[in-house]
Design a protein with these regions (language model features):
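ATP/NTP-dependent adenylation/nucleotidyl-transfer catalytic domains that generate, transfer
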Residues: 163-165, 222, 234, 248, ...
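Enzyme catalytic cores with a strong preference for nitrogen-chemistry domains
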Residues: 1-351, 369-378, 410
Length: 640
């Protein structure tokens, strides 16, 4: 349960139709195996104690009595199990038969939830036997000493070790309807929905089922466990595939191979779900819990080993097709944002500083797209290259080639002499390569860009990316400042893919060659003199790998996770790539710089938001510039 993770399982025992004795023996074995594998929430299919396909045998008292007796037997047999288990059965109460899910924990039947929506169409004819369940809870006598609450408005909460875990139940058809019970469950506080199902298999139904479960988990910001009937059910008219699904907020974490009765496992991140709900004020505004009852279940505190995939590049889709689509979309957002700003200001000239590095390259590509959308000539893009003390031949030549290939107007201003004069004016020794030496060059370049823009009634286009802004890796009032920053919410790991996508799709071989070489060039501000003609100042040697910092940024900003949890996730994501000492070193650097450099982000120029994470002080990050990082650093100091 550490860090809010809970391991769950969807189980499909092979049933024998109308044999509760054999079925409960098999359920016990399957549940015990799932628990042995660490599952703490275990879900079995709809009516699994009897089998779903009993037909008119559901009207036989012998079957109903046996199902009830075997439920009690199963609860006792699983008494020592450290888990909460959900099983399905038919249950008579006050003259009506209900299709129910029973929750078992520590030898007790802690609650019963009836099915709300009873299908009676096509191959389904449940209304022949079952009645819709009531919302309000009422007591049901299952057996002596087993007086159990039953109702659809019941939630089960893990009070002791993981209070964020609140479970709501729906049964099969319930989720296929326009108004699933899980909606009101979630608004009443349920963070995990379990669905005991018997969904038969027809061509293409698995795709719809998967999207339905994933979509419901996204809509409700919850985890969702879907356990469906499989092999063993009657095939008189239909076939059941045992299609089990575990989803979390729109993402399928685990899914069984159909027709195998496979148990699937995953860990659901309850803290992540609670974080999402905390941020979405409209979710809380719709909450309603006054008519719900909560019953506690208990599991022992334990450390959950993570088997779920942790993406080392959360900003970048792993699938090439999805990645290309994302890149196309982001370039469109960036260029449309700039297009609107140029239209509003009636600027027909843009000024971009071109270094031959990734960020300025992307900014120029976006500016070109904006001008093309406006049907303005590219010659009105003033691409300014400003060689300084650290400029290498490679970046200089790439800058010139890039400008030429894109058809922008080249302006070259060598800043070395102007900076030397400035150093003399302020008494700076040129041989002392300190922060003044570096920032003096950055501010000189910004001054040149601003003045060229003023001279030509133009707009300075900012090049800095979100990763640099998160770390404060920008000169205040130097490259930090512009009139519109097109890269302001694009992380460095994504910048690389955007440029690569453009190179792959532009259809210009010469331009592609230049872009590929830019991609191959080490990231550097080039403010220190080169060594033997090569870049001496490499950003990632100084502040750390951007793939780590983007990973940290994502989980800090997107979910507000604590350092310990982010460290744990990074260990999983970067296993075999970075050792723990390296991950921890740069995690410290990230937090220290993220807090100390907020003053730079507090006065950022406008720029378009492209993803769920952004650092604009007017939108996503309203953080005080003088906040203390102490408690975060204290937590990091205790990590190993």
């Amino acid at each position: 349960m550490r860090d809010g993770f809970i391991k769950v399982a969807a189980v499909t025992p092979k049933v024998v139709v109308a044999d509760p004795v054999e079925n409960t023996i098999r359920i016990k074995a399957a549940v015990m195996e799932a628990a042995a594998n660490g599952a703490k929430v275990i879900v079995c299919p709809e009516l699994c104690i009897t089998g779903y396909t009993c037909g008119d045998l559901f009207l036989q008292e012998t079957l109903l009595r046996s199902a009830r007796e075997r439920l009690v037997w199963l609860a006792k047999e699983l008494g020592a199990l450290d888990a909460v288990v959900f099983v399905g059965l038919p249950l008579m109460h006050e003259g009506k038969l209900y299709n129910v899910a029973a929750a078992l924990n520590k030898g007790e039947i802690i609650g019963i939830v009836p099915k709300t929506h009873i299908p009676n169409y096509n191959e389904f004819y449940e209304a022949r036997y079952f009645s819709p369940g009531k919302e309000e809870a009422e007591g049901v006598d299952i057996a002596p000493a087993y007086h159990v609450p039953m109702g659809s408005h019941i939630l089960f909460q893990c009070d002791d070790v993981l209070p964020e875990l609140v479970i709501g139940v729906e049964i099969c058809e319930d989720v296929w309807t326009p108004n699933p019970p899980s909606i009101s469950h979630a608004l009443a506080g349920a963070t995990l929905i379990v669905n005991l199902s018997a969904s038969d298999e027809t061509t293409g139904k698995d795709i719809y089922r998967r999207e339905l479960v994933a979509g419901q988990s996204a809509r409700l910001l919850c985890g969702y466990i879907y356990a469906s009937a499989g092999d063993g059910e009657s095939t008189q008219d239909v076939v059941y595939s045992g299609h089990n699904i575990i989803a979390e907020n729109g993402v399928v974490l685990a899914e069984s191979e159909r027709f195998t009765n496979e148990t699937v496992y995953s860990e659901i991140d309850m803290e992540r779900l609670v974080s999402e709900r905390r941020r979405m004020s409209t979710f809380a505004a719709g909450s309603r819990s006054e008519d719900y009852l909560r019953f506690s279940f208990f599991i022992d505190k334990s450390d959950t080993t993570l088997s779920r995939f942790v993406d080392p590049a959360p900003f970048v889709p792993g699938n090439k097709g999805k990645r290309d689509k994302r890149c196309e979309e982001i370039l469109a957002i960036q260029s449309m944002g700039l297009k609107k700003r140029l239209e509003h200001t009636r600027c027909k000239c843009a000024v971009v500083g071109i270094s031959g590095g990734l960020d300025s390259t992307l900014a120029l590509l976006v500016t070109v797209q904006a001008f093309d959308r406006l049907k303005l000539p590219r010659e009105q893009i003033y691409a300014v290259t400003m060689p300084g003390f650290g400029t290498t031949d490679r970046t200089y030549e790439n800058a010139l080639s890039l400008i030429r290939c894109l058809g922008a107007k080249l302006i070259e201003v060598d800043i070395k002499e102007a900076v030397r004069i400035h150093f003399r004016d302020i008494g700076q020794d040129e041989s002392v390569h300190d922060v003044t030496y570096e920032n003096g060059q950055a501010r000189e370049r910004t001054q040149i860009l601003m003045d060229i823009a003023n001279k030509n009634n133009g707009m300075v286009i900012g090049t800095g990316d979100m990763s640099e802004l998160a770390l404060g890796w920008a000169t205040y009032n130097g490259d930090h400042m512009s009139m519109y920053g097109v890269n302001v919410s694009v992380p460095k790991t994504l910048v690389r893919h955007l440029v690569h996508y453009y190179a792959d799709t532009c259809g210009n071989k010469e331009l592609s060659t230049v872009l590929y070489d830019v991609l191959d060039t080490p990231v550097s501000p080039e403010l220190l003199p080169p060594e033997n003609g090569k870049i001496a100042q490499k950003t990632e040697d100084i502040v750390g790998p951007y793939e780590l910092h983007d990973f940290y940024l994502y989980y800090v900003m997107r979910f507000g996770f604590a350092p310990a949890k982010i460290y744990r996730l990074a260990q999983v994501a970067f296993a075999g790539q970075y050792d723990n000492a390296v991950i921890l070193k740069w995690l410290k650097t990230f937090y220290r710089r993220f807090f100390s450099q907020q003053f730079k982000r507090s006065c950022l120029p406008d720029g378009p938001k492209v993803g769920t994470v952004a650092v604009s002080p007017r939108g996503d990050l309203r953080m005080p510039s003088d906040a203390s990082v102490r408690i975060w650093m204290d937590e990091i100091e205790h990590l190993k």
